[in-house]
Curated annotation (Swiss-Prot):
UDP-N-acetyl-alpha-D-glucosamine binds at residues 91, 120-124, 304, 326. It comes from Nitratidesulfovibrio vulgaris (strain ATCC 29579 / DSM 644 / CCUG 34227 / NCIMB 8303 / VKM B-1760 / Hildenborough) (Desulfovibrio vulgaris). This is UDP-N-acetylglucosamine 1-carboxyvinyltransferase. It comes from the Bacteria. Disulfide bonds: none annotated. The gene is murA. Cell wall formation. Adds enolpyruvyl to UDP-N-acetylglucosamine. It catalyses: phosphoenolpyruvate + UDP-N-acetyl-alpha-D-glucosamine = UDP-N-acetyl-3-O-(1-carboxyvinyl)-alpha-D-glucosamine + phosphate.
């Protein structure tokens, strides 16, 4: 197991290229199951979850090959079972459920794993698929799904679930008739999935709004498709510029998709602007100021940026309040930040952050993907040395982060524990 060792206190200066989006790539790769012809993806990040997805696709009968940032998938002899050995490491693996039911009429998918950050029930997926004619039972830790042919249905989500919207969107492309997804997730990654499916021949309208309409088609063909840039990786590097007092230019950075994050960072005393070369981020003269953040579904402030911005709040003048409305138990990074000298108090789904003058390096332990990023950011700004343990979480969502940070002046290295 590896750890990161960070010598803090160095302003980061230079250019970072933003990788392809993990959260877009995972469902789009799963959608390969729907196509009857080869599919080629570019701008795919080389991450642990992507490699796991490629292995899963190969086991399901869609051999996937990775070369550079390109993944080629060749659907051939489809099989319905997603085994526990792969699914246990990644919650997104449940996204193969809808495509398998649409193509084969059956699926046997182990209950998913992934980050332990609260309840992420698959019930919303199953209830919606049942409205399309699927039947489910739980057997020895596996979701067993069967259907003759999925039928179009009017589905209302009680909450704009991203995974549920993606699963139903994929299933609906090959269903008989029209499917309407109401109170659907509007996240950019959902829009990217819809655009990919349309490129394969699907008939979809309304993606990016709360009502998506899908007219089922008999088959989907192959295509070539470029994965969108990762807005969460980009947001993490924007915070890195602010927390170290440096100046970073992000190339390939999604601008519109980061609006809620940029508004808050500018309010805290950063200057972020779009230029002809990319997105420029630096700290304004006068230091950082506290602000309040409430996580919400898109286009609100993303929960996946909450932990990183909290690290910045730790060094901002005044008091900041974070309200976490999406996931339970997503303050697991707080105790580790406190070990570094942060002043944070938790009350239910709220965290009150009182800014301090400095953070101090310490041994800390990552509990999930975004908590890992939060601790790396804190380590970059801290006085002294920070050891971030259990970075396998980090490797699930950030492509070679230590190499990218070192290239702009950070002193960070990976060591075996």
């Amino acid at each position: 197991m590896d750890k990161l060792v960070i010598e803090g206190g160095v302003p980061l200066t230079g250019t970072i290229n933003v990788s392809g989006s993990k959260n877009a790539a995972l469902p789009i790769l799963m959608a390969s199951i729907l196509a009857e012809e080869p599919v080629t993806y570019t701008n795919v990040p080389r991450l642990r979850d992507i490699h796991t997805t490629n292995k899963l696709l190969s086991i399901l009968g869609c051999p996937a090959e990775f070369e550079g940032d390109t993944v080629s998938v060749r659907p051939c002899d489809l099989k319905p079972e997603a085994p526990y050995d792969l699914v246990k490491t990644m919650r997104a693996s449940v996204l193969c459920l809808g495509p398998l039911l649409a193509r084969l009429g059956e699926a046997r998918v182990a209950l998913p794993g992934g980050c332990a950050i609260g309840a992420r029930p698959v019930d919303l997926h199953l209830t919606a698929l049942e409205k399309m004619g699927a039947r489910f039972e739980l057997e020895e830790g596996y979701i067993i799904g069967r259907c003759r042919k999925l039928k179009g249905a009017h589905i209302y989500f009680d909450f704009p679930t991203v995974g549920g919207t993606e699963n139903l969107l994929m299933a609906a492309t090959l269903a008989e008739g029209e499917t309407i997804l109401e109170n659907a997730a509007r996240e950019p990654e959902v829009v990217d999935l819809a655009r990919f499916l349309i490129a394969c021949g699907a008939k979809i309208e309304g993606h990016g709004t709360s009502v998506i309409r899908v007219q089922g088609v008999p088959r989907l063909h192959g295509c070539e498709y470029a994965i969108m840039p990762d807005r969460i990786e980009a947001g993490t590097f924007l915070v890195a510029a602010g927390i170290t007092g440096g100046e970073l230019l992000l190339t390939g950075c999604p601008w519109e998709e980061l609006d809620a994050v940029i508004v808050k960072l500018n309010a805290m005393g950063m200057h972020i602007e779009k230029t002809s070369e990319g997105v420029l981020a630096k700290r304004r003269n006068g230091g950082l100021r506290g602000t309040d953040v409430t996580t919400q579904p898109f286009p609100g402030f993303p929960t996946d940026m909450q932990a990183q911005v909290m690290s910045l709040m730790c060094l901002a003048e005044g008091t900041s309040v974070v309200q976490e409305n999406i996931f339970e138990n997503r303050f697991m990074h707080v105790l580790e930040l406190v070990r570094m000298g942060a002043d944070i108090r938790i009350s239910g789904r709220s965290a009150v952050v009182r800014g301090v003058k400095r953070l101090t390096g310490a041994p800390v332990m990552a509990s999930d993907l975004r908590a890992s990023a939060s601790l790396v950011l804190a380590g970059l700004a801290a006085r002294g040395t920070t050891h971030v343990q259990r970075i396998y979480h980090l490797d699930r969502g950030y492509e070679r982060i230590e190499l990218k940070l070192n290239a702009v002046g950070a002193r960070i290295r990976r060591e075996a524990e």
